[in-house]
């Protein structure tokens, strides 16, 4: 029932008025307009199509009239009652009657009835934090101190907005300064929290001991207004909601940054796959050098960025756990609401700096890597020009292909790790949303308690007023009858008149009681119908909002699924092409080595070690044949130095 009246989701709460835009500003404006009236004054029955300025002007005019009437009634009750002839009572609106009853009750002296009312209020305030719908009530946001604190600009904006909304009602409340005094003659101060009662009592005692005679201090004390005790709590809950919304926006920005990094890595992978086809036309030495340099640079940049992100995530989780541990074990403290505000903004700042720092570090590493590539290319251009034989190109090609494959595997692993990080951030975002819904539930429970207290207060005030009116009317009638009967001389006429008057009184009492019963029944029926209509309207709005939200979520999930399928197809095509190229190269090497006469035809499957041994044997036989010819004195052109270097390098590799 109360979830329909006070919805916990932000979409349902923001769409309470169809003219308002869904956002934080509209929510705050409507919330402050309701709370500025003290939550004890019923809102005027205005149509929804009326603008906020018209509603505010109508509220202010009605409040001004009600306060003037209230002041006159309070001054009339303070004087001695004067007997006047019976007049027709003036009918007032329900809002004016409610305001007059509330302020008359607060301005009455401390008799037995007021003492019982005050004790009941204090008992209700003491028991309220233990209510099951209110989790460990305090004057600040419950278990939300680790979620972060707003910046100074946000705080200044909040102060400006609240001052503008309260400035209109401040002038109106100054008109009832005379009726806001208690028995001691002091103005009743703000009721901010339960923990401030002792301070206010001590301050009153100090004022009675050492009164201030200056007119400036007296004028400032007269400007203080009386407000309900729960307003400060509701304002702090609103402040906590604004902080949570700011944090949700920050998390969304971080998720966008991570998605952009993932797209950049995908683009790098595509560029590498495109550049792989161009590497076949390059010389073997230069291709090998470029592949080694690019592999080293890619590994460096990716490993550094990933390690930095891991450190930042671990640091952020540690800060979250450290800030959440003392909040869980702490007793409900109603007065300490401003202790942990300095530590709330640290995790978000660490995350922002970590994300931007990782991006800048990756950019700097790529710049340094490009400079090193240019220097190495200039140094090794001369060595690569000497390698011209086709047989020497096979080994660098094979190495370049293996390096490219390992680099592609590392890039794929990095992409999977970044997707895991994005999932973690989404989980944190859901946690903040659940905390946001908890805060809205606390506000709804507070509003429920306020409405319940107001209804009880209205019932008691209406009963008291009806009894007082009946008493006054009966006194006036008795006074008139005694005046008449004193003028009568005959006893019989006097007795007959008294009997008739008593019968009339009984009939009138019965009629009045019946009319009162009918009136109360009608009022109850009207109030129940109004509540049912409002509940049904809000339920319809909630259902519409939920439908729209589910549709939007379904569309987003469908688009994400299509993007993931496209990326998977691209990666599969690239992997199959690279495997086919590697298989063709291996087949060519096998054909070149085992097609020579004198080689053994292996019946089993040819392994990489067999191919390597065959190549080494061919090279060693060639060098032996060259040495034999040289020893016999046959003139043979000398072998090139690069060939001898390659044979020694291959022998070292086999020995290892």
Curated annotation (Swiss-Prot):
Signal peptide: none
Alphabetical keyword list: Coiled coil
Presence of the UniProt keyword Coiled coil in the record: yes
Transmembrane domains' residue ranges: none
Domain of life of the native organism: Eukaryota
Ranges in coiled-coil conformation: 241-278
Record's compositionally biased regions (Polar residues): 139-148
UniProt-annotated stretches for the region Disordered: 1-31, 139-163, 320-403
Biased composition (Acidic residues): 336-351, 369-394
Cited PANTHER family: COILED-COIL DOMAIN-CONTAINING PROTEIN 27, FORKHEAD-ASSOCIATED DOMAIN-CONTAINING PROTEIN 1-RELATED
Stated name of the protein: Coiled-coil domain-containing protein 27
The organism of origin for this protein: Homo sapiens
Gene that encodes the chain: CCDC27
